[in-house]
Amino acid sequence: MPRVKGGYVARRRRKKVLKLAKGYFGSKHTLFKSAQGQVMKSLQYAYRDRRQKKRDFRKLWITRINAAARLNGLSYSRLMHGLKLAGINVNRKMLADLAINDEKAFAQLAEKAKASLNN
């Protein structure tokens, strides 16, 4: 039985892995075996962090809204409840943007939330 080396198929597979490993430290970007392990781990991190990014941004928006709400005499939860009672449907991303870039508009929303909480 003749020896089979794999030919261009194996070379193509290895080149694909080494291309993904470009820029890695040490032997992880030159040696196939260590590169393959690192590429697999990197893809796992990428998959996990694409989901975690959504959570992280939501946390950031809530922190910013809470800070701005406290400057206007409300807590985050009371502000959100007041906005819901007032029928103002604004998502957290937009509220956080208003809190940073347009403090007057955010203050007006906070006043409307306060008014709807008092009624």
UniProtKB/Swiss-Prot annotation:
In alphabetical order, the GO MF annotations are: rRNA binding; structural constituent of ribosome
Entry keywords, A to Z:
Ribonucleoprotein, Ribosomal protein, RNA-binding, rRNA-binding
GO CC terms for this protein? ribonucleoprotein complex; ribosome
Query: Is the keyword Plastid assigned to this protein?
Result: no
Q: Which PROSITE patterns match?
A: RIBOSOMAL_L20
**Where do the TM regions start and end?**
none
Q: Which InterPro entries match?
A: Ribosomal_bL20 (IPR005813), RIBOSOMAL_L20_CS (IPR049946), Ribosomal_protein_bL20_C (IPR035566)
GO biological process: one example = ribosomal large subunit assembly
Q: Which NCBIfam families match?
A: rplT_bact
Q: Which family does it belong to?
A: Belongs to the bacterial ribosomal protein bL20 family.
Report the protein's function.
Answer: Binds directly to 23S ribosomal RNA and is necessary for the in vitro assembly process of the 50S ribosomal subunit. It is not involved in the protein synthesizing functions of that subunit.
- Name of the protein in question: Large ribosomal subunit protein bL20
Source species of the chain:
Halalkalibacterium halodurans (strain ATCC BAA-125 / DSM 18197 / FERM 7344 / JCM 9153 / C-125) (Bacillus halodurans)
